[in-house]
A protein has these predicted regions:
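C-terminal cell-surface anchoring/sorting signal
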Residues: 480-501
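Hydrophobic h-region of N-terminal signal peptides that target proteins for export
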Residues: 6-16, 483-487
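Ser/Thr-rich, Pro/Gly/Ala-heavy low-complexity intrinsically disordered linkers and tails
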Residues: 1, 15, 408-482, 494
């Protein structure tokens, strides 16, 4: 009887281990031999990665596999390979270290992380990711039975993501590139200084697209440029839909003959600060039922609800420029304050184009003007909004001042051998003046906020251009002048949704 009881308890016994690593070889071995519940700890130092590190063992909800630095940002992974870390199994967490792309050719450093297929519930937390074309790439993979496996429920939280110079590549440049997958949350991050010096000259801070659902962007600080360099390229802040998806890569059909009519559904953008972009701060491309709530956009060309399947609501946003319905897009416009001059922001806040919205002047006109909408309970600083009527924008000024230089618990700059830095200006000519409205930043005009352009060799392919925004930001321009394989033995209940073939 005792023997039977012991055998019955065996599945509940944890085989998790604490594994400390000090070299790249030890790290590779620890990842390759990981067990559910393992905590892999990186000793301080530099780890040079010359081929992909693969994470193929499945963690569980109760026993995720954790990879973290012993000292926050004391460990730096230097990547000289196309993909530094590939995650194809669920329940992995990565915390407290830095990664830097060091490839001599920018097109050879695509991703710090590629999360694919059955890699649901992956967490990136308190990381500093520098100098990759797309620091995070998420995409579906063929399941082998005519369907596709998709990673769901990812979380990117309190990370700093940036480039030290424009990326000299024709490949997509999007700091967080999330294709397919439901219920992704991008929260409390600092995304800054991203630019593309090649191809279509279009870059994004982040987008979610390719048929995903219920994505959330909240309390992020996005600075398309933190320095004073001129922008002749096209930089877009946050997006549902990006530049669109070739139909063979879009849920639910994954069929070249079926258009990707909805790039994202039921997405939410709330309490974000987006500043200093040459194009729109928020771009919605075939994004059905999207909520844009209490964001502050300074020195951008506003918000676009674009194309016939884009619907939604915009409530309580504070911004330079306008919120537009374009090409049959529709939305309800409620208690937004638009057309605010950069000079008015500068009179109210310490350094708004640098993301510092510490109050230095009067903000009285913006306080108490919004009837609280559904879907929001706090502000950018994670403070509960309790007043009967709220301040417009990301900050609830009735609660007093709060620090906005970086998001709550977000990236801290410096440390780990990596320092924050400007993305620089894109050389090689202008492509038109920043004239607002339909004017053209390079690659723009009324042309393509594409986020795409060809395919990369990691299996995460991007479409050709879908003709997105590209309307340059007058406010930002004037401000410059004035100021893979997871072994599919069984499918647990939390595995990715499989689409029909």
């Amino acid at each position: 009887m005792k023997r039977l009881l012991l055998l019955a308890l065996l599945p509940a016994i944890s085989l998790a281990r604490d594994v400390r690593v000090t070299t790249e070889a030890e790290l590779r071995a620890a990842l390759g031999g990981a067990l559910p519940g393992d905590v892999i700890t990186l000793a301080s130092g530099t780890y040079v990665i010359t081929s992909k590190l693969s994470c193929t063992t499945a963690g569980t909800p109760g026993q995720p596999i954790v990879v973290r630095a012993e000292v926050p940002f004391g460990a730096t992974l230097e990547s000289n390979t196309l993909i530094a870390i590939g995650v194809s199994a669920p329940f992995w967490r990565f915390e407290d270290f830095a990664m830097r792309g060091v490839c001599p050719v920018d097109s050879d450093c695509e991703h710090a992380f590629q999360v694919t297929g059955l890699a649901t519930d992956v967490v990136l937390r308190r990381l500093r990711l520098v100098d990759f074309n797309a620091q995070l790439k998420v995409n579906a993979t063929p399941a082998g039975d005519g369907g596709y496996d998709m990673p769901h429920r990812g979380l990117v939280e309190a990370c700093e993501v940036f480039d030290t110079r424009p990326r000299a590549t024709a490949n997509p440049v999007t700091k967080l590139n999330i294709d397919t997958g439901d219920d992704f949350v991008v929260r409390d991050n600092f995304l800054h200084d991203f630019a593309k010096n090649g191809g279509n000259f279009i870059s994004y801070g982040s987008f979610m697209k390719s048929g995903g659902q219920r994505g959330v962007y909240e309390r992020n600080l996005v600075l398309c440029r933190s320095g004073g360099q001129a922008m002749t390229d096209t930089r877009i802040g946050l997006s549902f839909g990006g530049g669109g998806t070739a139909p063979q890569f879009c849920y639910p059909g994954f069929n070249a003959a079926v258009p990707c009519s909805v790039e994202h559904a039921d997405g939410v953008l709330r309490n974000n600060i987006v500043a200093n972009c040459s194009d729109v701060g928020v771009y919605l491309n075939r994004a059905r039922n999207t909520s844009v709530l209490h964001n502050t956009l300074v020195g951008t060309n506003g918000v676009d609800f674009r194309f016939g399947t884009t619907t939604g609501r915009a409530v309580g946003n504070l911004l330079t420029s306008a919120i537009r319905a374009r090409d049959l897009g529709t939305f309800t416009d409620t208690q937004n304050v638009t057309g605010v001059a950069v000079a008015a922001f500068a009179a109210a806040y310490a350094s708004p184009l640098a993301g510092d919205l510490s109050v230095t002047g009067s903000v009285t006109a913006w306080v108490g003007v919004v009837t609280p909408p559904s879907g929001v309970t706090d502000d950018y600083c994670a403070r509960t909004r309790a007043a009967a009527r709220w301040t417009v924008g990301a900050l609830e000024h009735s609660l007093g001042n709060c620090a906005t230089g970086k998001p709550p618990d977000g990236g801290t700059g410096g440390g780990g051998g990596l320092t924050g830095g400007g993305g620089g200006s894109v050389s090689g000519g202008g492509g038109g003046s920043a004239t607002g409205g339909g004017g053209s930043a390079r690659g723009g005009g009324s042309g393509s906020a594409a986020g795409g352009g060809g395919s990369v060799s990691d299996g995460g392919m991007e479409p050709g251009a879908v003709s997105g925004c590209g309307c340059a930001s007058l406010e930002s321009g004037l401000a410059v002048l004035a100021l893979a394989l997871f072994r599919r033995v069984s499918r647990p209940a939390w595995a990715g949704r499989k689409a029909p073939g």
